[in-house]
Amino acid sequence: MRTLEDSSGTVLHRLIQEQLRYGNLTETRTLLAIQQQALRGGAGAGGTGSPQAPMEIMAPEDSQVLQQATRQEPQGQEHQGTETHLAENGLYRLCPQPGKGEELPTYEEAKAHSQYYASQQAGPWPHVGDRDPRGPPGGSRRQDEALRELRHGHVRSLSERLLQLSLERNGARTPSHMSASHSFPQLARNQQGPPARGAPTAEGPEPRGPPPQYPHVMLAHETTSAVTDPRYRARGSPHFQHAEVRILQAQVPPVFLPQQQQQYQYLQQPQERHPPPHLAALSPPGVEGPASTQASLATSGSTHLAQMETVLRENARLQRDNERLQRELESTAEKAGRIEKLESEIQRLSEAHESLTRASSKREALEKTMRNKMDSEMRRLQDFNRDLRERLESANRRLASKTQEAQAGSQDMVAKLLAQSYEQQQEQEKLEREMALLRGAIEDQRRRAELLEQALSNAQGRAARAEEELRKKQAYVEKVERLQQALGQLQAACEKREQLELRLRTRLEQELKALRAQQRQAGTPGGGGGSGGTPELSALRLSEQLREKEEQVLALEADMTKWEQKYLEERAMRQFAMDAAATAAAQRDTTLIRHSPQPSPSSSFNEGLLTGGHRHQEMESRLKVLHAQILEKDAVIKVLQQRSRKDPGKVTPGSLRPAKSVPSIFVAAAAGTQGWQGHSSSERQVDASAQLAADRAPLEEPVAVAPLAAHAKHGSRDGSTQTDGPPDSLEPDSLLGCSSGQRTASLDSIATSRVQDFSDMVEILI
């Protein structure tokens, strides 16, 4: 176990050192966290490990980088901290950082780029003619960009960068190959189509870029400037330089530097000779170079091709090394993952072992305490058992002595009990003879009590019947008095209403006479002054219409009073029927209660003798109940017959009620006296009828007191103001005109509809 932990610790130390030198900041922090977790686990299990041991093994420069890596940057400045850490390294000073938004291709895309570039090697070299007139500063800037890309090139190889640079400069020549590829969308994205041949632009000849600059090339003056720069002297030793940079500097051939200078000189020379066919298409028309320029271009192109072959071979070798290193890195990462899983499992097992040991120690302590408690309990129970045995022996001894004494005393007690039982038997025989004599006397008394109870029940029945008759007579007297009072009130109200109607009729007749006289006076000068009589005619017409409307209002009010009176009568009859039914039910209940068997003090003696009398009383009570039901039904039948007699005499909705309603009240009173025979009185009905009769008088007074205009009345049947026929016309049709006739018809229809609605409402209430 200890050996495995040591081996995993050494592997982690090596990984951390390599990551501090060649890796990025996030992976370094991850490995440091893993190491600290492993050290904590080892220190918790064994207690011998020290977290400061791996820090002592590291190199000074690694510990310095570790201190910078473990420092926590402020929030929102993560990128700034990373760039500060990278700027302190000498290699990153030589390699400027790329833009943050630069998109890096994957390994598969780089491999496809290299294959595509190898297929394009056989064609003519297109970079000679595409020179940028800007000169060497553009090439140095591209070299700086290539070195900046080398900082992020842990996964990308040199062939990827070469292919990207060559495609950026030669993308205009082969657009069809790029756009036709569906497998590499990044190639098709970065390409732009060339301009049409023979179509000159207003800006003159199109500037082209310099030949491809490879990231492994570093010019002499740039190298010297980077070394002589005072910013780089502090950390310019080979110890701080990256291994790949040292290899690339060693692999730069000495011949390549003057050739680069020659290429920069070619950018400043005019093109005197004709370029090759594939370059002539890209150059503008009318531009030609001298023969010396063509020869130098050919020689430089051949040397450049030879250098490209060497670079490609080196690129293939580096690619193989990269793949091998990548496989080793994957295997190492897999081993590290396994080691981490093993460490976590070991830590989990150690924690489980500790928990088991703690649980076992607790269990042992608990078992020990329970054993001690059980031993003490057993000792206590043994002592208690010993005491119980002693007490049982003493109790057995006392019980044996007591049984002997009890046997001696029981024999004496048996002799005494036998003597007492003989005496009690003699007394029992004597009591039986006395009981037989008493039973005979009790039977005689029971017969006398039955006779007395029969006489008492007969007397009570006669008294109850007399009381019932007395109550009925009193109720009849009270009803008659209340009906007489109600009748007097109704008669007074009717007389008052007749007087009011008579006064109203006389007043209306006087107004009618006055109106006819006015009409005659207005009709005599009608031929001479037609223009002056028009407002008088309109005033007469309006006054006549006002009278008609007031007459209709009076007729409707009279109908309303008639229907109110009829509703009160019907309500009184219905209330009388309900009171009759309630009275019959109450009488039936009182009869049952009074004739029910009542317990008496001597009922325990004569229960067997009074069964026949009780049956007879029950039969009588049932007969009385049936008689009360028959009376109730007779009352309902009489009410229905009276209502059926009143139905044929109903007045039509358009006609008015008769003036005198006294005979109808007498008929209702006579029917009530016939139906109330044998029933109890209803105080609520009499009070309601008296109250409604008293309320009708103030309702009729405003009708007569209100100021009314003159009305034209018709011939009445019984001397009252109400009539059945239609009203006579007060003026001719020539005076009324068409508009007044239409208004009168509409008013009549409205009044008729109101009367019908009111009659329907009354019928619903009934």
From Swiss-Prot:
Pfam families: Angiomotin_C. GO terms for biological process: actin cytoskeleton organization; angiogenesis; endothelial cell morphogenesis; establishment of cell polarity involved in ameboidal cell migration; hippo signaling; negative regulation of transcription by RNA polymerase II; positive regulation of protein localization; regulation of cell migration. Monoubiquitinated at Lys-341 and Lys-402 by Crumbs complex-bound WWP1. De-ubiquitinated at Lys-341 and Lys-402 by USP9X; the interaction may be promoted by cell contact inhibition. Deubiquitination of AMOTL2 negatively regulates Hippo signaling activation. Residues 64-79, 176-193, 291-302 have a biased composition (Polar residues). Residues 524-533 have a biased composition (Gly residues). Residues 64-103, 121-144, 171-213, 262-302, 516-537, 676-743 are annotated as: Disordered. It is found in: Recycling endosome; Cytoplasm; Cell projection, Podosome; Cell junction. A motif (PDZ-binding) lies at residues 763-766. GO terms for molecular function: actin filament binding. Residues 101-301 are annotated as: Required for interaction with CDH5. The record marks 107 as: Required for interaction with MAGI1 and ACTB. There is a cross-link at residues 341, 402 (Glycyl lysine isopeptide (Lys-Gly) (interchain with G-Cter in ubiquitin)). Keywords: Cell junction, Cell projection, Coiled coil, Cytoplasm, Endosome, Isopeptide bond, Phosphoprotein, Ubl conjugation, Wnt signaling pathway. The record marks 214 as: Required for interaction with YAP1 and ubiquitination at K-341 and K-402. The modification Phosphoserine is found at residues 746, 749. Regulates the translocation of phosphorylated SRC to peripheral cell-matrix adhesion sites. Required for proper architecture of actin filaments. Plays a role in coupling actin fibers to cell junctions in endothelial cells and is therefore required for correct endothelial cell morphology via facilitating transcellular transmission of mechanical force resulting in endothelial cell elongation. Required for the anchoring of radial actin fibers to CDH1 junction complexes at the cell membrane which facilitates organization of radial actin fiber structure and cellular response to contractile forces. This is Angiomotin-like protein 2. It comes from Bos taurus.
